[in-house]
């Protein structure tokens, strides 16, 4: 290594960065959108099959016909991804299912293939295309099914317990203690019963049986006293009365009700994850840990003693007897009588001494390891969960923390789709059953039985309107990637914003390496929407796992063997940090190592370490890992930094940061915005729109050339957010490429790296107060050289429909429009590509037939002379809205004749794309990567900017007061290191938690020949004098955010009014006015500005007659007339009259003012020079 700290690392083909990382990466980052693609693949391979298996066979009520699902296959999609986007269609493939109908009376079998609707496919990028728009299905964090125990204090401060058995779907079972030490059960949220009633109903009728089963104790005695039933049948009737109040109870009904509630797999489903969690929780291994045996354990087969009475079961003893436990030690077969189920129940029961009372023996009952494929609850589950509850009262067992990630799981795309599909199938099943009983059994075919409507509808509903199916954030590649890795606790079956408390939202120790503690939205969703950590994976049960390096217990060496652990597995181990020092062999060099165990950070002897972190950045998400010097920023500001990077607008000339973290390449590659090579090969041909790669493969050590892969690049397409999506080649002809390499840069990418902004020269200084309150002062050079210029594409559409009075027509023959306005329209009335348009220009000329009114003689004469045209149409052309001017980029025309699919009633659809080049502007919002955001307040000429001793003017001035109180010092370190990197002509990588430290920064500054304090003298550009103090000047990476002033600027003279109050609407989207509210009125009253106040409350707002006359007067240049009565005052009077009050208006000389009646409204509105009256909800339609 040369004289500097750090070493060179290559990122992709074109970029080398000097990395300051000290920890070598043991594990490559996984594919970052695997959470989407793997889950959907599971659904196609297994999820669908599982569902058809669950529902099959469907039998009719008599049991004569049975319909079975044999197999399914997905055909080829109707349109390609690109075509689906252009045609506003779904990217979907037809699902065909093979059905078999068996007539049991005749033994006849009919096989048939049935089409079951088009099924949306996932693109390679992990998105779906629904109605032409890219959407993402966000994974949902929900409480895992299983059994949970929690401690609670009642109002007298007495400690009690509660417990819940939560299924995936089905009835809940809850246990709780009350103030009198009685244990109650609630079945499906009904009123509570003593828990012994449930045990009797399961077939343990007498008090003695229950005491023998659970073990004698005070709680049980109290509960038996409270219980008024004394046998199984009475207990069953008691439960039936609770569940079905008001129906006459019979024992048989009660039995079948309980069976259907709990033991019927169709009505009660734990899912495999629920069965796994229940078996794990009720397993005797964890419950016997550190307890003292109260009986001698004997192997039932050999008769040998495994453990004797009085033994303490520590980890070693326990590990020895676990195999015996699972082979039947302590198994008891219970024979219930008269209960719900006739079958005998197998449980496992072992006696120990209670830890809080050495004399007392207690029974620990397990569920005897039920098979994984039993998805419903069983009597032995119920008995062992009741046993666990009683054990808790004696101090055996643990309560659960529901915010622990071992108890929360992810439902990803595949499972969400499966649940939705299941709803559709079960609706279909009902229809099939009905049809089976109605139709002729001899002639019926599967096709006639099946109605695919409910299935298609449920899928459509899920993709179109579910809370978890979201319009993809495509502002830039990072936003796209983060959206696919988002985890939401909201949505159907999840939490709601209002109900979620602080605990759920808080950072939990089990989030380590699984969910990012930093990246979450500010506002009402904070902590409910999270991001997956960079190395995390999701296992088959939906729990998030994170990788750790295993420590060999014999040698205490850290190996390169990687284990993925879920949160509850990790709870058993001590984990060392990634930056613990190791020698060459992988042994810890220090005797005491900083490590984590559950929620504690401890210094531990090195022999006790079980695992070690894989990488320092495994804690944080991808967006957070893109912030250099994250370790020097306050967490609140880091949160803003991570969130604002996702809002960066793609620039015309993007530039990768001088100071990066090494994540830029990976995140760009996996985001789906770049073009990546599908196979190894040699680039044969490169042009702006296409790259050809000749495949090369190794066969028996020889290179063999194969076919050509053609990659199309997307040029100047509109993204979901209206930014410009443009791909540029990143390779040259003759280059050798490997699979997965970036061939073409997407938006916001530079040489295969994420490039959200630009490196600019920043000085921390004030300048005439223009950067007060985080405002930013900028040099005009950034405007002139298009440094922060971005391209925006907006889409406008116009459709010609059939109306009652005849079809609308697209034409350039528009009433009352001069030839000048039509100069850029072609003969069909559609704008030409390349035309420059301004606000209110015509894009598509369109006329709509008007209702025919009776004509006067004069009008008839005019018609006779000038022909029909003048009469029956009005102008409904598409015009450029305010702030939408630009250059016409593209025009797409869809017509019925050309065979395009259009909505019913639409004959022709025209889409016009207008592109704008937006330079940076005062009022635009900019930010760094450390949460340092601000609005541009002034753009100064270059010659007025402060300049450095060599004459270079700075680009941006930031307020130094923005740093100390916000505690984001990372920006200052980035500033100095960036300056040094630019001077040395290198790019650097400083990974999070393992990047450049202070010495590294200063040594790089020195190497670059800068001053020791990295500050410089600046001269005032206006006077040429030096400023008093030395100033920190350096290179910072600044991004332009999607909050641009062009989208917010808005002005109105006249426009639409609300229907009832006749006041202007609000908001830019409705072309509304500025509200002059109650407080503003007080301000004018305080000034005594009577006339100003009068016109604001009348002619500028809702004095209908007055505003028309005022408008006329201004146009004609006359004086403004007297204001009339505001409409809202009339509304008030009408409201009072509706209460039965007689209210009159009097003028100053006590004459009654006649209120203009509602019939006159039409008259004024027709004469209104700017007609537009809108109901208030019309606003919503316009914003669509």
Curated annotation (Swiss-Prot):
The ranges of region (Disordered) come to 1160-1184
Pfam family of the protein (one):
RNA_pol_Rpb2_45
Per the record, what are the reactions this protein catalyses? Answer: RNA(n) + a ribonucleoside 5'-triphosphate = RNA(n+1) + diphosphate
Q: Which UniProt keywords apply?
A: Antibiotic resistance, DNA-directed RNA polymerase, Nucleotidyltransferase, Transcription, Transferase
Q: Which InterPro entries match?
A: DNA-dir_RNA_pol_bsu_ext_1_sf, DNA-dir_RNA_pol_bsu_external_1, DNA-dir_RNA_pol_su2, DNA-dir_RNAP_su2_dom, DNA-dir_RNAP_su2_hyb_sf, RNA_pol_bsu_bac, RNA_pol_bsu_CS, RNA_pol_bsu_protrusion
What biological-process terms (Gene Ontology) are attached?
A: DNA-templated transcription; response to antibiotic
Give this protein's Gene Ontology molecular function annotations: DNA binding; DNA-directed RNA polymerase activity; ribonucleoside binding
Q: Which residues cross the membrane?
A: none
Which CDD domains does this one have? Answer: RNA_pol_B_RPB2
GO cellular component terms, semicolon-separated: DNA-directed RNA polymerase complex
PROSITE patterns recorded for this chain?
RNA_POL_BETA (PS01166)
Identify the EC number(s). 2.7.7.6
HAMAP family the record matches: RNApol_bact_RpoB
**What is the annotated quaternary arrangement, including any partners?**
The RNAP catalytic core consists of 2 alpha, 1 beta, 1 beta' and 1 omega subunit. When a sigma factor is associated with the core the holoenzyme is formed, which can initiate transcription.
Q: Which family does it belong to?
A: Belongs to the RNA polymerase beta chain family.
Q: Which PANTHER family match?
A: DNA-DIRECTED RNA POLYMERASE I SUBUNIT 2
Identify the NCBIfam families for this entry: PRK00405.1, rpoB
The job of this chain, per UniProt, is described as:
DNA-dependent RNA polymerase catalyzes the transcription of DNA into RNA using the four ribonucleoside triphosphates as substrates.
Name of the featured protein: DNA-directed RNA polymerase subunit beta
As recorded in Swiss-Prot or TrEMBL, the protein's gene is named rpoB
């Amino acid at each position: 290594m040369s004289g500097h700290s750090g070493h060179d690392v290559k990122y992709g083909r074109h970029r080398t960065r000097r990395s300051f990382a000290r920890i070598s990466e043991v594990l490559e980052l996984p594919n970052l959108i695997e959470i989407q693609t793997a889950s959907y693949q599971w659904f196609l391979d297994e999820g669908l099959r599982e569902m058809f298996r669950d529902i099959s066979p469907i039998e009719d009520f008599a049991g004569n016909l049975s319909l079975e699902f044999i197999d399914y296959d997905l055909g080829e999609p109707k349109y390609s991804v690109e075509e689906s986007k252009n045609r506003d269609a779904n990217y979907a493939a037809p699902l065909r299912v093979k059905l078999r109908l068996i007539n049991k009376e005749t033994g006849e079998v009919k096989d048939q293939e049935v089409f079951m609707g088009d099924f949306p496919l996932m693109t390679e990028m992990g998105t779906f295309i629904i109605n032409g728009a890219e959407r993402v299905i966000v994974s949902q964090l929900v409480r895992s099914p299983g059994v949970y125990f929690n401690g609670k204090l009642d109002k007298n401060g007495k400690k009690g317990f509660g417990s819940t058995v939560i299924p995936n779907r089905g009835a809940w079972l809850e246990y709780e203690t009350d103030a009198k030490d009685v244990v109650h059960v609630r079945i499906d949220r009904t009123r509570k019963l003593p828990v012994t009633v449930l045990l009797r109903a399961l077939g343990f009728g007498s008090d003695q049986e229950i005491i023998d089963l659970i073990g004698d104790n005070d709680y049980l005695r109290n509960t038996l006293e409270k219980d008024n039933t004394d046998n199984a049948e009475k207990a069953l009737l008691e439960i039936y009365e609770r569940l079905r109040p008001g129906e006459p109870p019979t024992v048989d009904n009660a039995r079948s009700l309980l069976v259907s509630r709990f033991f019927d797999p169709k009505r009660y489903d734990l899912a495999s994850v629920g069965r796994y969690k229940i078996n794990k929780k009720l397993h005797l291994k964890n419950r016997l840990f550190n307890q003292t045996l109260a009986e001698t354990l004997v192997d039932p087969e050999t008769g040998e003693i495994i453990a004797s009475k009085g033994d303490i079961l520590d980890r070693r003893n326990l590990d020895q007897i676990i195999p015996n436990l699972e082979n039947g030690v302590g198994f008891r077969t219970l024979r219930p009588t008269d209960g719900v189920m006739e079958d005998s129940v197998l449980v496992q029961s072992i006696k120990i001494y209670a830890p809080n009372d050495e004399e007392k023996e207690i029974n620990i009952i397990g569920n005897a390891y039920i098979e994984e494929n039993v998805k419903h609850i069983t009597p032995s589950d119920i008995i062992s969960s009741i046993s666990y509850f009683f054990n808790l009262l004696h101090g055996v067992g643990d309560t659960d923390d529901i915010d622990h990630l071992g108890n929360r799981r992810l439902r990803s795309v595949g499972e969400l789709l499966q649940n939705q599909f299941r709803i559709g199938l079960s609706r279909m099943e009902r229809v099939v059953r009905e049809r089976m009983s109605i139709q002729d059994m001899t002639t019926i075919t599967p096709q006639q039985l099946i109605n695919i409507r409910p299935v298609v509808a449920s899928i459509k509903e899920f993709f179109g309107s579910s809370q978890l199916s979201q319009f993809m954030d495509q502002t830039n590649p990072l936003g796209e990637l983060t959206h696919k890795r988002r985890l939401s606790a909201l949505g159907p079956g999840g939490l709601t914003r209002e109900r979620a408390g602080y605990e759920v939202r808080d950072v939990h120790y089990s989030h380590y390496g699984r969910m990012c503690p930093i990246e979450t939205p500010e506002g009402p969703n904070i902590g409910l929407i999270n991001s997956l950590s960079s190395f995390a994976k999701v296992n088959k049960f939906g729990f998030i796992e994170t990788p750790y390096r295993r420590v060999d217990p014999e040698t205490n060496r850290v190996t390169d063997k990687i284990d993925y652990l879920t949160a509850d597995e990790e709870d058993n181990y001590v984990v060392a940090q990634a930056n613990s020092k190791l020698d060459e062999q992988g042994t810890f060099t220090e005797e005491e190592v900083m490590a984590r165990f559950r929620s504690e950070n401890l210094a531990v002897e090195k022999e006790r370490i079980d695992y070690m972190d894989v990488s320092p950045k495994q804690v944080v998400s991808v967006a957070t890992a893109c912030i250099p010097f994250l370790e020097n920023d306050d967490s609140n500001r880091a949160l803003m930094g991570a969130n604002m990077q996702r809002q960066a607008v793609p620039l015309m000339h993007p530039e990768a940061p001088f100071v990066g973290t090494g994540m830029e390449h990976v995140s760009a590659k996996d985001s789906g915005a770049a073009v990546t090579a599908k196979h190894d090969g040699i680039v044969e041909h490169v042009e702006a729109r296409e790259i050809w790669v000749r495949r090369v493969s190794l066969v028996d050590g020889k290179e063999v050339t194969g076919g050509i892969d053609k990659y199309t690049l997307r040029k100047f397409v509109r993204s979901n957010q209206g930014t410009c999506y443009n791909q540029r080649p990143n390779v040259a002809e003759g280059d050798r490429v490997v699979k997965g390499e970036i061939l073409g840069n997407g938006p916001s990418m530079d040489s295969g790296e994420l490039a959200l902004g630009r490196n600019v020269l920043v000085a921390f200084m004030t300048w005439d107060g223009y950067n007060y309150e985080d405002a930013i002062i900028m040099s005009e050079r950034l405007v002139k050289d298009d440094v922060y210029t971005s391209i925006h594409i907006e889409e406008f559409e116009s459709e010609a429909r059939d109306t009652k009075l005849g079809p609308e027509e697209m034409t350039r023959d528009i009433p009352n429009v001069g030839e000048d306005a039509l100069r850029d329209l072609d003969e069909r009335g559609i704008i030409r590509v390349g035309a420059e348009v301004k606000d209110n220009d015509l894009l598509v000329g369109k006329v709509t037939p008007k209702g025919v009114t009776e004509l006067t003689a004069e009008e008839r004469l005019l018609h006779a002379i000038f022909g029909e045209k003048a009469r029956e149409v009005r102008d409904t052309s598409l015009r450029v809205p305010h702030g939408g001017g630009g250059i016409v980029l593209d025009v797409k025309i869809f017509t019925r004749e050309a065979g395009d699919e259009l909505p019913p009633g639409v004959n022709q659809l025209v889409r016009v794309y207008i592109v704008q080049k937006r330079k940076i502007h005062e009022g635009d919002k900019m930010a760094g990567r450390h949460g340092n955001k601000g609005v541009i307040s002034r753009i100064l000429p270059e010659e007025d900017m402060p300049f450095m001793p060599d004459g270079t003017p700075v680009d941006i001035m930031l307020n130094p007061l923005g740093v100390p109180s916000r505690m984001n010092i990372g920006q200052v370190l980035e500033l100095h290191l960036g300056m040094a990197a630019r001077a040395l002509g290198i790019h650097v990588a400083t990974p999070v938690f393992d990047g450049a430290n202070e010495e590294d920064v200063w040594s790089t500054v020195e190497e670059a020949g800068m001053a020791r304090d990295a500050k410089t003298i600046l001269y005032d550009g206006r006077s040429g004098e030096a400023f008093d103090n030395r100033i920190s000047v350096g290179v910072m990476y600044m991004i332009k955010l999607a909050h641009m002033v062009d989208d917010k600027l808005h002005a109105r003279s006249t426009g639409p009014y609300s229907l009832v109050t006749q006041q202007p609407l609000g908001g830019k989207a409705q072309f509304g006015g500025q509200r002059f509210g109650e407080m503003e009125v007080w301000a004018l009253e305080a000034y005594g500005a009577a006339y100003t106040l009068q016109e604001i409350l009348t002619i500028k707002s809702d004095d209908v007659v007055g505003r028309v006359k005022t408008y006329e007067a201004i146009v004609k240049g006359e004086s403004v007339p007297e204001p009339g009565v505001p409409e809202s005052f009339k509304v008030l009077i009408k409201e009072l009259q509706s209460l039965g009050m007689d209210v009159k208006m009097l003028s100053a000389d006590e004459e009654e003012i006649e209120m203009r009646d509602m019939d006159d409204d039409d008259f004024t509105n027709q004469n209104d020079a700017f007609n537009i009256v809108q109901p208030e909800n019309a606003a919503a339609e316009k914003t669509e």
